[in-house]
């Protein structure tokens, strides 16, 4: 992120969702930024998403964890739509959802009166989203062709950590924002309690799909380098329980503690965050151009 070449291996983490391969997470010794390195390039990473359990690309995914995700999504979509409407002065406007998945948030926003645009790399998810939203969903490459200043709000819900062209994409997203518009970025927090508690089994490392592993400090630095300030840092408390549920499944059988362990870890993570400057399992950053 900062351009330093002083890098050190931080962790060696296994992809327990798809390939079972091991990947290295490195940390910059200058700015503290953590990232998966080496990682598959954009042309070859698609195979690491080829799982019916990857719920953000597959509305038909089954099982307890995926059903829990869908129940939580029903409630969080409402909260997300209410939030963007509040940030836009209480009125619907023009929304760009970058990495819109199967389109549930877009559909909720459209129902609330927003003019919506969705971009999504997965062909399967695009088709699902198009049916759900009732309009075409484009590939991410379209971002560079969108008119400058055409959106009141741009959202990335657990997407930025997947983007190969990090700086270029951020610049294009900022360009698409109108003056005074808001950029919302939700990402896992590598300095959360549950990240430390589950360590190598922490599901939100999600290598190699997650290329970057942000903390509030490194997110602040990244956005500042693009001329943005963080106006709000909002908790995503349900993520602590969902990530803990996935992480318990990643543990060896003899170390799993079932739903009791999930509830304890989720509660402890949120309690820790409330006492330590909002270090939640996932954080939603509301950013805008610096004055």
Task: Please identify what each model-predicted range represents.
Residues 163-164, 177-179:
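Helix-to-beta-strand junctions that scaffold the AdoMet/dcAdoMet cofactor pocket
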Residues 185-212, 217-223, 245-250:
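Short, glycine-/aromatic-enriched active-site segment of Class I SAM-dependent methyltransferases
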Residues 226-228, 289:
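A structural motif corresponding to the C-terminal end of an alpha-helix
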Residues 157-164, 186:
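Short catalytic micro-motifs in class I SAM-dependent methyltransferases
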Residues 1-149, 153-157, 166-172, 235-238, ...:
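Conserved N-terminal segment of class I S-adenosyl-L-methionine
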Residues 116, 183-184:
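A short hydrophobic/small-residue beta-strand
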């Amino acid at each position: 992120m900062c351009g330093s070449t002083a890098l050190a291996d931080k962790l060696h983490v296994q992809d327990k969702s798809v390939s079972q391969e091991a990947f290295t997470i490195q940390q910059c010794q200058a700015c503290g930024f953590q990232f998966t390195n080496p990682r598959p390039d954009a042309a070859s990473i698609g195979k690491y998403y080829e799982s019916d359990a990857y719920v953000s690309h597959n509305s038909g995914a089954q099982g307890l964890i995926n059903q829990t995700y869908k129940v939580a999504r029903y409630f969080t979509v409402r909260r997300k739509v209410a939030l963007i409407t509040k940030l836009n002065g209480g009125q619907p406007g023009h929304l760009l959802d970058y990495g819109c998945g199967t389109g549930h948030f877009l559909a909720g926003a459209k129902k609330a009166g927003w003019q919506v645009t969705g971009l999504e790399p997965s062909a399967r998810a695009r088709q699902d989203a198009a049916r759900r939203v009732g309009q075409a969903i484009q590939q991410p490459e379209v971002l560079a062709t969108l008119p400058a200043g055409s959106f009141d709000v741009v959202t990335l819900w657990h997407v930025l950590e997947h983007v190969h062209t990090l700086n270029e994409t951020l610049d294009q997203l900022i360009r698409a924002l109108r003056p005074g518009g808001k950029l919302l970025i939700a990402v896992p927090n590598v300095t959360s309690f549950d990240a430390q508690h589950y360590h190598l089994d922490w599901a939100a490392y999600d290598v190699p799909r997650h290329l970057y592993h942000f903390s509030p400090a490194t997110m602040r630095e990244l956005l500042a380098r693009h001329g943005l300030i963080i106006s709000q840092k909002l908790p995503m408390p349900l993520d602590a329980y969902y990530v803990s549920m996935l992480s318990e499944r990643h543990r060896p059988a003899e170390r799993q503690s079932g739903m009791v362990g999930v509830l304890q870890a989720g509660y402890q993570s949120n309690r820790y965050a409330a006492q330590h400057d909002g270090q939640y399992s996932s954080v939603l950053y509301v950013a805008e151009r610096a004055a």
